[in-house]
Amino acid sequence: MSYIKKLRARLDSGEISAVELTKEYLAKIKEQDKRINSVITLCEAEALKEAEDADAIISAGKQGLLTGIPILHKDLFCTKGIRTTAASKMLDNFVAPYDSTVTKNCKDQGMVTLGKLNMDEFAMGSTNEYSYYGAVSNPWDLERVPGGSSGGSAAAVAAGFAPISTGSDTGGSVRQPASFCGLTAMKPSYGSTSRFGMVAFASSFDQAGVLGHYAEDVAIMLDAIAGECEFDSTCVGVKQNHFTQDLEKDISGKVIGVDESLIKDLPAQIQEAVSKTLDNFKKLGAEIKSVKVPDLKEALSTYYIITPAEAAANLARYDGIRYGYRNPEARDLDELYRKSRTDGFGAEVKRRIMIGNYVLASSQYDSYYNKAQQLRKVMTDQINQIFTQVDAIFMPASPSEAFKKGDKLDPVSAYLSDIYTIPANISGLPAIAFPIGFANNLPVGGQLMAKAFNDNILTQMVVQYQKHYGIEEFILQQARI
């Protein structure tokens, strides 16, 4: 079950050329994205040139699995010669002089870059309402959010603008949008994909991820972008075909841990979807085992102390001098710094910078930042201990279905929507979200988390699940291939 393989067959048979396929997707984006607002920069000329190159490779019989396959990138991956904004006024005119490792790996595989995607500014948000370029709409219901921060990445694939997209995941930023938009998305183990050329939010949490309809497509794409990188010292890489190596194997004997206390207070329809999903895994031969997951509220508090601290340090580079927005009315250096950053950053980014600077202040450092780091270590050890008993841990991907725009503009309310996804980022573990049912006629997602660098177990389990139980009901008509 793979859109990439379906398109590969069409391209190889000559049913359609890469240029024709690219034109189809570009036309759909231009016609339909006005109501969704998922694309910041459409790369029409560049895409058609890349498609022509792909057709030449196909004609010569030298194509790979991804040659000529269209893709959309979250607009925090640097793309040489193309604007990279991170959805911020601060970088509105920034044209990257180099490619990120993620986008370069895609280009090297012959993929066609259709454009750059909307997101929460600097990846800070869970609703995609915090963008300089406006909020993104959920294709399932245009009055609702697509999730965040990779909301554009999820909305674009759900709307059929590309078969696959890249995103980043700092606290659930590919998995929560996937849950809201009926997609499959994965945050791989920390260090398996390079962060070089990826605009930084919180460096010890950030990781590139992928969103698509099918788990097999997600696995194929992660194999394409993963690997060692000489420009990222935290990138340890993974062996070739790490994500796709076990997709055909059944999951009989796999043990899935479930903490019932995380499910009992969910809305009834989501509880039903979770129960049905676990029953289906049992039918596939998996064993369900009761486990105790560390307190998620403590995880949330830890996350929202450490990540703003890292963000405050990372965003200090935007000073109005070296690059980025510069206020034209400043009369001296101090005013230039102050006005450029005040005007260039949105409200949510400024909120997190202020929190970060507060917890890093000498008077607060031990009370907040140090304690949060200690708790992060304790929680990571506790989660890893669970994996001595199980192969994966199952949780919901979000406590609700997609909510309406404006419903969670209160920051704390919005932060709570990350409660199930944050543990994987705190501990650097791989996690995959996939559609499991509906609540109020909107898709909801489940999530599996595994031990570090056991990513292949997750892709295997979800590919087998989707092979037996299908996901057609989660694919909107306009996105079908």
Curated annotation (Swiss-Prot):
Which Gene3D superfamilies would you find in this protein's record? Amidase signature (AS) domain
Name the residues annotated as catalytic in the UniProt entry: K74, S149, S173
Provide the GO biological process annotations.
translation
Q: Which NCBIfam families match?
A: gatA
Role of this protein: Allows the formation of correctly charged Gln-tRNA(Gln) through the transamidation of misacylated Glu-tRNA(Gln) in organisms which lack glutaminyl-tRNA synthetase. The reaction takes place in the presence of glutamine and ATP through an activated gamma-phospho-Glu-tRNA(Gln).
Q: Which UniProt keywords apply?
A: ATP-binding, Ligase, Nucleotide-binding, Protein biosynthesis
Q: Give the UniProt family note.
A: Belongs to the amidase family. GatA subfamily.
Can the keyword Ribosomal protein be found in this entry's annotation?
A: no
Q: What is this protein called?
A: Glutamyl-tRNA(Gln) amidotransferase subunit A
What catalytic reaction does the record list? L-glutamyl-tRNA(Gln) + L-glutamine + ATP + H2O = L-glutaminyl-tRNA(Gln) + L-glutamate + ADP + phosphate + H(+)
Q: Name one Pfam family in it.
A: Amidase
Q: What is its EC number?
A: 6.3.5.7
Which PROSITE patterns would you find in this protein's record?
AMIDASES (PS00571)
